[in-house]
Amino acid sequence: MKKYKVYDLYEGKETLGYADTMDEVKLMARDQAEATDGECLVVCAELNPDTGRYRFSEYKEVRI
């Protein structure tokens, strides 16, 4: 499983994809910002290795 799950929370909770590194997360965020003319709120949730689930309650906003 990938380390991060990436979402756009601007209008709902759209999953953008999964990434292993923060560089990949930032690339997804840049692509989403370009596709939506900046009307997005991209966040990422880190994988909890103990449960195999993503910690959405502890998500981090991705700064572009």
Where are these predicted regions, by residue range?
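Short aromatic-glycine-(Arg/Gly/Cys) micro-motifs in beta-strand/loop hairpins
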Residues: 1-15
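Short, mixed-charge low-complexity intrinsically disordered segments
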Residues: 31-64
